[in-house]
Amino acid sequence: MNRKSFLVSILAAGCFVATSLLMPSTGNAQADPRVAKSMASLKAAAAKLGAGKLDGKEAVGGKDAPALYFGAAKINNNFDVVDAVSKEDGKGMTATFFVKSGDEYIRVSTSVPKPDGSGRAIGTVLAGPALESIKAGKAHYGEVPILGNPYMTGYEPMKDGSGAVIGIYYVGYKK
């Protein structure tokens, strides 16, 4: 191998490593551009309100859950942020804030509808491949079944000021 080929190989390997480190951890697919854009919007809207924290409890969808706050804004049963992110996309994007409760993650604010269309799917618990990624402290991007329907999704761990995972940011659209 000549010097030029060697340098090109090293450069290509370096680009691959850098890309791998900078991209979010994913499930079976790379982040869909729509999902990535909406995830950035959801996280920015939350950050604009203030740091995330858990304080007290509040029932959501008939299930007791830790109360999630961004700054002074309580997120449980408050749909302003998720609705704004969903409307920003304008093409069926959904958004959710999950809160960690023991080993479960409970939807406390969402634009995801119940399967029967009778309201929002708050109080439901995350299950499936995204849960395993989050438990490992990693993001999950790809197709995931949500309440029986296929969605192209993104899930990212939500951390408090100490770095502890307190919930999950979710965005996705029905395929």
Task: Indicate where each model-derived feature is located.
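Short N-terminal helix-loop-first-beta-strand/juxtamembrane motif that initiates sensory/input modules
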Residues: 36-55, 83-105, 141-143
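Extracellular/periplasmic ligand-binding regions of membrane signal-transduction receptors
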Residues: 31-75, 112-118
